[in-house]
Amino acid sequence: MAGMSYLGNIERYHEHRNAIHELLGSILTGVSDNRLFTDERALRRALCDIAEHYPFVDMLFTLDIHGVQSSENVVCQTRGWADSARGKGKSKDRSQRPYFLLARESERVVVTDPYLSTASRNLCVSAALKWLDAEGRALGYIILDVDLAATIEFLMGDTDRRRFVPAFRFVYSLIVLGLFAVVAVLLYGAFQE
């Protein structure tokens, strides 16, 4: 059984939109800490702690108040695309990205609509939070990218099923090969007469 198509993922996103937004909001508010803007190790620890419990989380990074990335991309996953994104992105202008534009106008966690990730080339959504100091001034923004298909699977409890798909394919392939062998033997026997 193959993964869902992009259209299937978008349809599922709209079905589970509120649950996805609440989940990402709770994850992002749980990691918010002033040290994330100054300490790359704290940022890495925060993401790896999140990824341990939420396997759909792809990347975490921070932006300054102007929308310029102030940290490197922090990636704890071992997916094929992760090495090309890990440790990059610092000083990139993200001021026109949807997550920044939404977060700039809000004091709460915002979640983008699905879009193709430039890092993973998969559909993703981003959650963003404007981080304020004690006086209410913006320090910057915390951005969390998640794989949309994996998030939907997590919410629907499909992660275990997906893990067994290769085993099912193998078993089905053996059955099909066995049936072809039976057909071949029968055809051989029929032509020998």
Locate each region found by the language model.
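Amphipathic alpha-helical regulatory segments at dimerization interfaces
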Residues: 45-53, 102
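Extracytoplasmic/periplasmic sensor domains and loops in membrane signaling proteins
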Residues: 77-115
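GAF sensory/regulatory domain recognition
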Residues: 64-82
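Acidic surface patches and DE-rich sequence motifs
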Residues: 64, 117, 133
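Conserved beta-strands of PAS-like sensory domains
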Residues: 120-159
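Short N-terminal helix-loop-first-beta-strand/juxtamembrane motif that initiates sensory/input modules
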Residues: 52-69, 109, 159-173
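Alpha-helical transmembrane segments and their helix-membrane boundary motifs
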Residues: 164-193
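Extracellular/periplasmic ligand-binding regions of membrane signal-transduction receptors
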Residues: 2-45
